[in-house]
């Protein structure tokens, strides 16, 4: 075969002709040469593209890792800012310094990272270049915030005189909290322009193209608008919230409430006045926060809203109780109140026999509680000379009982009248006439236990929020009346243990008072007034009106528009059968009458739950179950109609006769002298009709019993793990 060059040189024309013929044939049978070239080009480009994509992927991973490092540093920045803010909030300059050092260090490290030459290549891509520039702007904002906000704020806290390495407890309303509030107020006044400057820079910050970086700053983009929304309130805060609060906290810190073994009432009034002063501002800012559009983006704002809700609620309570406290404390004059502990084991219509009585006195502005003593040493049996009895009182509450003995005043469920009788009797045998009477049943002691914690009695028994009343009203009697060595002394011992418990709880409540315990006490009193566990009476008309407005009076129903059915029960005998009384009242559906009144069926079940074993024990220890009646409850029961209404159609499954009369313009049915034997239930049914035009279903007011505490047991003691 000849070489191609030789062929060409010998017959060039022939070769050209063949070539032309070949091209014609190829045109008829195969794709064009250009298309063949395109396919090759595609293959080459694809190969090259794959190489480029591989390179880009490698670079992307590399720079993605670098970007993630920036994101991690950004998270560290946020953590430092949060730590600094928390330290400043708690008045801890030392922790704030440490957080700022960490913040500045992280910012510097990020700047060095952004200046690294490795970023030169990706900078040729516009979005990456823009993100790197935006990251630098973020660091500018961080550095500016550190320089013109955080560092001046830290210096202000340090210069305030607060301990530099300790947190201020913002809940104790003490002098240090007041000092910190002064700092807050000055900072808001002085740093508002700097804050505006930082917010403007943040508002002008471009968005990141890299998603993970934008995610790190996205929620903070709302801060400028949020600050603008609250700008007016922020500027109001120093003079309408912080400085007024600081004035009170530094002048009358809440921890100065306890003074000379008593309560400094000027501190109480100061904080109530403060509540009235700052309440409008707190209401405004609370409303603004709850109506804001950023709650989902800022969990801190949710916490603040919840905190302000609590504060607003506290201030409402302070405002609510202020008239009562002013009436109780007065204008600096001396006051004295009886504090009566009604014994539910010896059940009476108003609560119980007044087994223990203490005093609350206010002298030179200091409130002190005297020790509880047995009623026999405090309230005489004879009535005060000012007490005169109506015919209905004699009929309902018995001449040989209520009328004859001042200590039996609780046979009348109308607490203002009962308290008036006790106060008059006390005044008869003492030089001082009480300004009022405060009534407590044992229930309140157990309700206070979550605030005070457990107490241990002199006999070694520990009482807590789960086991207290059942011991004092039930178990203690079996412990002492059932032991021969306490014969003749059991009654005095059990009464003294009850008084000891009351004194211990009172001491713990008053020994280290703070706002939380004070508000907790108010809440317990408010709840306990609803079921007649806590009641008050004052001889001063203005004070009594404040008590009535709060619902603390224990008075019988007097408002036809708020109808109330009264069911009250007494055991007319000396015994401790109260724990076995179950009193249930059910009000059925009402029926509209032609005259616009509503009639309701009512059923009352009265049970004696004493079992045979207890009865046997009681027979051997007569005072528990009544020596004379051996477990049978000698009963007196009252059914009061709602104000402006009527009561009728009495029936009883045990054929107990119910009579009718009136008391203070209220219709009342009553039955007395009947017995409820152990294990027996007596059912009364009747109807009540409300005043015309009153559609509200009547509520039930009744004597508080011990049913809810029945059979509660001591909390198991943890074993010593040594």
Report each predicted region and the residues it spans.
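Acidic, low-complexity/disordered segments
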Residues: 716-719
């Amino acid at each position: 075969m000849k070489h191609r060059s030789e062929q060409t040189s010998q017959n060039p024309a022939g070769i050209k002709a063949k070539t032309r013929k070949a091209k014609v044939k190829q045109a008829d049978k195969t794709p064009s040469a250009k298309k063949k070239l395109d396919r090759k080009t595609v293959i080459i480009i694809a190969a090259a593209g794959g190489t480029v994509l591989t390179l880009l992927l490698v670079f992307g991973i590399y720079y993605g890792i670098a970007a993630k490092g920036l994101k991690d540093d950004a998270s560290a920045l946020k953590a430092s800012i949060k730590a600094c803010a928390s330290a400043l909030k708690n008045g801890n300059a030392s922790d704030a310094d440490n957080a700022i050092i960490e913040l500045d260090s992280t910012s510097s490290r990020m700047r060095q990272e952004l200046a690294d030459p490795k970023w030169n290549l990706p900078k040729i891509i516009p979005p990456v270049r823009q993100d790197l520039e935006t990251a630098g702007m973020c660091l500018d904002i961080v550095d500016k915030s550190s320089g013109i906000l955080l560092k001046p704020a830290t210096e202000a806290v340090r210069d305030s005189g607060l301990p530099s390495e300790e947190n201020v407890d913002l809940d104790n309303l003490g002098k240090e909290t007041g000092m910190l509030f002064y700092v807050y107020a000055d900072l808001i006044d002085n740093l508002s322009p700097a804050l505006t400057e930082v917010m403007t820079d943040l508002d002008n910050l471009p968005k990141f193209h890299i998603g993970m970086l934008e995610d790190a700053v996205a929620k903070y983009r709302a801060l400028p608008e949020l600050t603008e929304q609250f700008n007016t309130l922020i500027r109001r805060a120093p003079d309408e919230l912080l400085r007024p609060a600081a004035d009170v906290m530094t002048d009358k810190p809440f921890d100065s409430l306890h003074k000379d073994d008593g309560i400094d009432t000027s501190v109480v009034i100061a904080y109530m006045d403060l509540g009235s002063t700052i309440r409008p501002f707190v209401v405004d800012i609370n409303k603004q926060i709850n109506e804001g559009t950023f709650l989902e983006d800022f969990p801190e704002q949710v916490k603040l809203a919840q905190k302000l809700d609590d504060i607003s609620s506290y201030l409402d309570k302070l405002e609510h109780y202020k008239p009562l406290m002013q009436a109780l404390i007065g204008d600096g004059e001396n006051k004295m109140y009886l504090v009566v502990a009604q014994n539910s084991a010896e059940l009476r219509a108003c609560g119980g026999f007044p087994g223990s009585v203490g005093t609350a006195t206010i002298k030179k502005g200091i409130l002190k509680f005297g020790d509880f003593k047995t009623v026999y040493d405090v309230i005489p049996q004879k009535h005060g000379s000012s007490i005169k009895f109506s015919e209905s009182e004699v009929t309902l509450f018995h001449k040989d009982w209520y009328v004859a003995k001042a200590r039996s005043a609780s046979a009348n469920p109308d607490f203002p009248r009962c308290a008036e009788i006790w106060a008059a009797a006390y005044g008869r045998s003492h030089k001082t006439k009480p300004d009022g009477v405060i009534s407590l049943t044992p229930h309140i002691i157990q309700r206070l236990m979550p605030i005070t914690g457990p107490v241990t009695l002199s006999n070694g028994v520990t009482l807590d929020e789960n086991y207290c009343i059942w011991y004092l009203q039930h178990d203690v009697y079996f412990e002492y009346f059932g032991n021969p060595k306490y014969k003749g002394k059991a009654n005095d011992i059990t009464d003294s243990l009850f008084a000891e418990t009351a004194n211990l709880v009172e001491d713990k409540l008053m020994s280290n008072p703070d706002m939380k315990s004070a508000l907790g006490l108010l809440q317990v009193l408010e709840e306990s007034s609803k079921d007649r566990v806590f009641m008050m009476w004052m001889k001063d008309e203005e004070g009594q009106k404040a008590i009535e407005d709060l619902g603390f009076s224990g008075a019988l129903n007097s408002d036809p528009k708020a109808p109330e059915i009264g069911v009250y029960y007494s055991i007319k005998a000396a015994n401790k059968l109260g724990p076995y009384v179950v009193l249930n009242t059910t009000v059925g559906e009402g029926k509209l009458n032609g005259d616009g009144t509503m009639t309701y069926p009512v059923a009352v079940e009265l049970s004696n739950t004493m079992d045979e074993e207890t009865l046997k024990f009681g027979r051997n220890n007569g005072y528990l179950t009544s020596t004379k009646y051996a477990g049978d409850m000698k009963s007196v029961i009252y059914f009061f109609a709602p104000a402006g209404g009527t009561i009728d159609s009495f029936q009883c499954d045990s054929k107990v006769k119910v009579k009718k009369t009136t008391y203070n313009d209220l219709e009342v049915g009553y039955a007395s002298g009947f017995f409820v034997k152990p294990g027996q239930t007596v059912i009364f049914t009747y109807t009540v009709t409300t005043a015309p035009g009153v559609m509200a279903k009547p509520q039930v007011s009744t004597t508080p019993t011990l049913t809810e505490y029945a059979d509660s047991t001591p909390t198991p003691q943890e074993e010593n793990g040594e």
